[in-house]
């Protein structure tokens, strides 16, 4: 009987670990919704920028992402043994927050540069955060395919409240980098426990 209790307790603790690991999905999904929906809508209405330059800036950020993901992935895999995962996670969220702040507080007369820098910061932040975060997911699953499925399921399931949060931020508030930073810190904290 005691063996069954221990197994159940261990199983429940693993589920709690998977849930805590997945909490950053909420602010990340919120940020992605904000960037992909609000930024094009806002910048396309600025006379100097327009829809064409807005699309070009976002496409440029995706091309940069396509190039940097494998390079940073290889680099981070080599550096994780020396520095650990948390360092790279700590770089990622501030980059995302700085990028969002730049996007929603463009400098007068420098809207195009603000747009380009903002989407590049956000994209690099997602790369610096996502690659190590996914690596942590593999590590906590202990290479068990059933646990890996649970980790990914929790992580992706928590993107749903993140999408809803992002939509609320767009609809009900004046979005700024400070709001996202506060939300990020709140949901990022379980990773550092």
Residue ranges of predicted features:
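Membrane-embedded alpha-helical bundles of multi-pass transporters/translocases
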Residues: 2-193
């Amino acid at each position: 009987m005691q063996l069954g209790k221990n197994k159940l307790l261990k199983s429940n603790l693993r589920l709690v670990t998977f849930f805590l690991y997945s909490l950053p999905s909420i602010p990340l999904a919120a940020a992605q919704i904000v960037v992909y929906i609000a930024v094009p809508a806002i910048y396309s209405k600025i006379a100097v920028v327009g829809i064409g330059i807005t699309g070009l800036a976002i496409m440029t950020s995706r091309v940069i992402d396509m190039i940097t993901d494998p390079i940073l992935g290889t680099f981070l895999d080599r550096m994780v043994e020396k520095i650990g995962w948390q360092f790279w996670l700590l770089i990622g969220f501030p980059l995302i927050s700085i990028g969002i702040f730049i996007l929603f507080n463009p400098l007068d007369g420098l809207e195009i540069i603000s747009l380009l820098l903002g989407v590049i910061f956000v994209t690099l932040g997602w790369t610096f955060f996502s690659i190590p975060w996914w690596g942590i997911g593999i590590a906590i699953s202990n290479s068990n395919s059933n646990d890996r499925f649970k980790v990914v399921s929790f992580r992706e399931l928590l993107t749903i409240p993140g999408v809803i949060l992002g939509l609320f931020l767009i609809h009900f508030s004046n979005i700024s980098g400070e709001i996202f930073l506060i939300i990020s810190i709140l949901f990022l904290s379980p990773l550092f426990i």
